[in-house]
Amino acid sequence: MVHALHETHRVLKPNGLLLDLRPGAVHRRVGIEVDGQYRQLAMMNESLEDDYAANQAVAEVIQKGVFKLVSRIQVNCNRVMALKDFPNWLSDFPNDRAAQQERLIRIVEHAFKEAKGNRKRVVVKGPLVLKVLRKDQV
């Protein structure tokens, strides 16, 4: 990752900006919303190793003066979907935790079945972090 950041630095024009937009390195919360009321059901247990490595790489190039941190903002991001779309969305995560994913699907399906209301949807909550980095002349 550090190599990729150095390559980005190489191709950016002087004082160019790099926008680093990634999910925050926290486990996402999974719940359902019924008629506008949210209820958390579970916390995902996805691997955060890649997130930690990316954060470390960005911190390293900032510390070395390759880039300067201009600003950082964290915003809540709610991924909203129909129940039928949840298993497909979940399949985007590494499949080394297939049993946990199946259990999570069953929990959400059961909550949907038991919930009383007209408008039901799955909501996955987690932060997005945007860092704006400026190319420094090394």
Task: Pin down the residues of each PLM region.
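Alpha-helix N-cap/loop-to-helix initiation residues
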Residues: 1, 26-27, 79
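A short glycine-rich, Lys/Arg-flanked "PGG" loop and its adjoining helix->strand segment in the class I
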Residues: 2-17
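Short, low-complexity, polar/charged sequence segments that are solvent-exposed and flexible
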Residues: 8, 37-40, 88-92
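Glycine-rich loops and low-complexity Gly/Arg-rich segments
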Residues: 12, 42-47, 93-99
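Conserved class I S-adenosyl-L-methionine
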Residues: 17-49
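Short alpha-helix
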Residues: 48-66
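Conserved Class I S-adenosyl-L-methionine
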Residues: 65-138
